[in-house]
Amino acid sequence: MKDPSRSSTSPSIINEDVIINGHSHEDDNPFAEYMWMENEEEFNRQIEEELWEEEFIERCFQEMLEEEEEHEWFIPARDLPQTMDQIQDQFNDLVISDGSSLEDLVVKSNLNPNAKEFVPGVKYGNI
């Protein structure tokens, strides 16, 4: 049995131009809201692949850091810029020779003292 108050005041919905959620009913697929599920497996596979790739990259970085620590490629005390005090200490530790050791080196040398001076890029004739 119908409610008499509804039958007299409710408009007729038989019109074909019914609009639901701002869209014409005849233009939309009634399942358009759920169409994303059509490719759900492909989407999940793609996301899983991206997660595996991120994990792989993270492991690579971790291995690189461990290798760097193992080989001590980066030593902050050696590789970072030094303070002015450290540079001054190293400068003060340098010894200026009086030249006598240089003369000893020349006397004990096996080089030819009469040889022409080497100039890069200049070709000399056959000797």
Swiss-Prot record:
The keyword RNA-binding appears for this protein: no
GO BP field: memory; negative regulation of translation; negative regulation of translational initiation; regulation of long-term synaptic potentiation; spermatogenesis; translation
Composition-biased stretches (Polar residues): 1-13
Tissue: Expressed at highest level in testis, but also abundant in brain, cervix, lung, ovary, placenta, adipose tissue, thymus and thyroid.
Sorted UniProt keywords: Cytoplasm, Translation regulation, Ubl conjugation
Post-translational modifications: Ubiquitinated, leading to its degradation by the proteasome.
GO molecular function terms noted in the UniProt entry: mRNA binding; mRNA regulatory element binding translation repressor activity; translation repressor activity
Location(s), subcellular: Cytoplasm
Annotated InterPro entries: PAIP2-like (IPR040396), PAM2_motif (IPR009818)
Protein name: Polyadenylate-binding protein-interacting protein 2
Organism: Homo sapiens
